Every structure is written in C-alpha cells, then in structure tokens.
C-alpha cells in the first residue's frame, strides 16, 4: 500500500479575512495519531509538498486557487499513476476534496473507471446550476461535477485522458443529507445517470442493500477498476464534527466500515481518497483517533494478502 499525503486546502473558502482552512494539516495529524502503525509495516508513506493558498481567485477564473489546484492535481496524478501501474493500492490522505481530481487523473490512465463517492454533500456545483461568471466559488463544492466533466476546461480536461474522468453512469454518490431541503443547491443531479443513495434512503434500506446497489453498478459495465472517495463529513456530526460542513443525519463508523470493507478488499479497487478532516476543529485529537480507528480496521486488498487482517 502507498499512503500518499496530500496536504492541501486549496478548494476551501476562508472563514474570515486572513483565515486559511486547516485541512492541509490533516495528513500529518493522522500520522501523529498513529495511522501508519494502524495500517501496518507494508505501508509506504509518500508526501506531496504543500501548495500555497490564496483567498483571491487568479485572473481569468472565479474559482479560488483554480490554477494551483490544477498544478497540485497533476503532481498528485503522477504519484497515483505510479502506484496504480505497479499494482499497489493508493490511499490518498487530504486535504480538502479537490484531491479527488488528481487521484482520478492518475488512476484513469489505467483505463476507464467507476467512482464510489461517499459524501454528506454531492459536490455537484457547476456552471449549469450557478452563475460562474459572477460568483466566486471553491472546488470543494464542485469535485463530483468536475470529475464528470462539468466546469471549466482547466479542471475537466487532463493529459492522456479523453472525455471526463468518470462518466455519469459509472458513479454512485452515497450520503447526501440536503437533497430534501427546499434550497438544495444542485437538484439537477437527479436528472443525470449518477446513481444516488441519500442518507434518508440509506436509513431505510441499510448497509446490505446499499452494498448490493454498489456492486450492481460495478458489475454493470467493463471499467478497468474503481476508485473510492471518502469525504469524512458523510459521518454524522456527533462522530465527526471536525469538518468544513458537519451535519446530521450521517453514517456511523460501523456503517462506513461495513460499506468500505468489501470495496477496499476487491482486486478492482485502485485506491481511495480521504478528505475534509480539519485538525483545527479537533483540538483534543479525538476525531483524528476516530478516523485512524476506522481506516486501520479496513481489510485492504494488500493487507489481506499479507495476512494482517483476519
């Protein structure tokens, strides 16, 4: 397993003038909380340099840190591509959820992909549902839209890849908690071929049925592999308050482990991004320990090969 530390906050907005979102601290905070030990001796740790954050969008776009996100994504893509091409599971620790773009850009070089997107928000903001010519925005609310080819070309077009990083019908989004709100930001996602299980549907059908829907998606086409995106705000805020936009209801740790285990142990799984944990909102480190405990008990395909997980 390659554990790729991606210390970025480029996709997030400042909370007040002069503020820098703290997600860039997450990889080191998780390492300090014992993640390397929890994953075991077979994990190799690789670290990307931290990019410089700027609260003001660059000339030519209203996407905050837009061009810096592309540059960081291209670097991350090289790391992920090397892992995937060597047959090694890539665990990418962010950082905000803009890390999904670079991870997919690297994994996609191996062939067509499916995406299992766990997130308390669908992150489907794109020029079709907001005024991109007037409103400043951050990629952290756009990652699924960009991954499916919606948005500015410098964040939807990638070297050696034709078309979007993943087509709509190769995506399942799990955990949205705002889809029943009157002011839901991206209702147009319901008119796409993206499979959705919002948190309310999940509460009705449970882990087994949700897992069956995921497996049905993975069996419905001939993608070379699949990628998992785990935005930790999909967990209930009582469990994971240390995120940009915490909320309830959400998944439990037990739910998440049960959903992830059959995926990370699958030979088709190329890797997983973990995003949006903010150590600045976790002064006693409790949330870091929760994440280390969750990630440390997963039956990654390489760990089962080494015999470290029963």
Question: How should each PLM-predicted stretch be described?
Answer:
Residues 2-310:
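Conserved alpha-helical scaffold segments that buttress catalytic/binding sites
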